[in-house]
Amino acid sequence: MTLVDKFVTHVISESSFEEMDRIYLTNRVLARVGEGVLEVETNLDKLIDLKDQLVEEAVRLETIEDSQTAREILGTELMDLVTPCPSQVNRDFWEAYAYSPEQAIEDFYQLSRKNDYIKLKAIAKNIAYRVPSDYGELEITINLSKPEKDPKEIAVAKLVQASNYPQCQLCLENEGYHGRVNHPARSNHRIIRFEMVGQEWGFQYSPYAYFNEHCIFLDGQHRPMAISRQSFERLLAIVEQFPGYFAGSNADLPIVGGSILTHDHYQGGRHVFPMELAPLQKTFRFAGFEQVKAGIIKWPMSVLRLTSDSKEDLINLADKIFQEWRQYSDSSVQILAETDGTPHHTITPIARKRDGQFELDLVLRDNQTSAEHPDGIYHPHKDVQHIKKENIGLIEVMGLAILPPRLKEEVEQVASYLVGEAVTVADYHQEWADQLKSQHPDLTDKEKALAIVKDSVGAIFVRVLEDAGVYKQTEQGQTAFMRFVEQVGILLD
């Protein structure tokens, strides 16, 4: 069977198109790929593989230019053929939701996989492993899924006339967007609309997922990130409306926030993060909220966990803690609420529903800088930035390291160095490599060396999180943490 015939057969079997539409679909494919593909045979069987071959044929036929951007644009256009229109996707979702919210979510997830919006083949390239620590098992990923632009495309992007449509990658206007060299193609993108706390929001999956069913809840309007009482209301509304999913927000200040601060959004998914498994190491009750179980969890960052079957109690208490933290200073442990009116304090909140109760984790954040730590006092310090120098956002806070692609090769180089091979180690890794070599001077087994290096990366990630923690894992730090808790107001024994 020819490539086009196979692809069209898949489209018919996996969409609302019928056999009568075969000629129409064939012509739609030829219009995009080029008529020279008509006689091309294929041994491939899977829809996404067939799409990828069609894209390469379009490059061969010079229908599209040989660039990542052109490939992405054509690929999403082809997969749009198996994707119902937005109104139909929403209709199907809410009709299924009326009978089973879980089934509605599952159906939308499977659609986002089937139509290649979730980039399964790219995600499979990521390196992922777990490492033991004093705080339980942590998750390490080296992110290889996001394709990097080549120098030519980067140069072209600089020359492209500025456009504010869509305003950012989270706007509703991305749904069906053709794409350009400096904005991703989204022809096959679909968003579920829903109302939350009186406003329109969208629910979509993340194309380059970092964990199972990684999804995004985005404001229907282009509004900046802001942590407020509404954040707690929305997060708890999400975990109630989307059963089985957690929901969390990045902080809303530079250094401690995520990469997108211009559009209010939350992240969620069906994944148990290491932080969720962290036990309470100290428990107490807040005055006026006796029905809320509260405590500090055993975690490298500073986290208050609140649990209750009352959403209202959780929202009120979380807001009280947040308002107190925004204005709280303690010079004895270098905690400062503001400098000349510029705020330093915010919270990274995470919500989940567990054993029938609502749970909120409030991670205290401080974005101060100093002469010693110009990138941030509570940010990865210089000696660990060879592994992680980017902001510690929501996902890392919960114990999943997202490390840059460069580390794949660099980790292997350090392992080779440990067994005495003649390799060049990156300057910023040399001190680390020498330290590991002094600890393992007689190492000859390459696999064992690689395991040692990977474990060391995990140990450094623990340090990264400890650096980001405002109250350190010392007697002084934990005593200071309790001073803040007492400032909020707890019941004394």
UniProtKB/Swiss-Prot annotation:
Keywords: Carbohydrate metabolism, Cytoplasm, Galactose metabolism, Nucleotidyltransferase, Transferase
Domain of life: Bacteria
GO molecular function, one term: UDP-glucose:hexose-1-phosphate uridylyltransferase activity
Entry GO CC: cytoplasm
EC identifiers of the protein: 2.7.7.12
Localization: Cytoplasm
Catalyses which reaction(s): alpha-D-galactose 1-phosphate + UDP-alpha-D-glucose = alpha-D-glucose 1-phosphate + UDP-alpha-D-galactose
Pathway annotation: Carbohydrate metabolism; galactose metabolism
Any single Pfam family the record assigns to this protein: GalP_UDP_tr_C
Database matches in InterPro entries: GalP_uridyl_Trfase_II, GalP_uridyl_Trfase_II_CS, GalP_Utransf_C, GalP_Utransf_N
Any one Gene Ontology BP term: galactose metabolic process
Cysteine disulfide partners in this protein: none
UniProt enzyme class: transferase
Family in the record: Belongs to the galactose-1-phosphate uridylyltransferase type 2 family.
Full protein name: Galactose-1-phosphate uridylyltransferase
Originating species: Streptococcus pneumoniae serotype 19F (strain G54)
Gene name of the record: galT
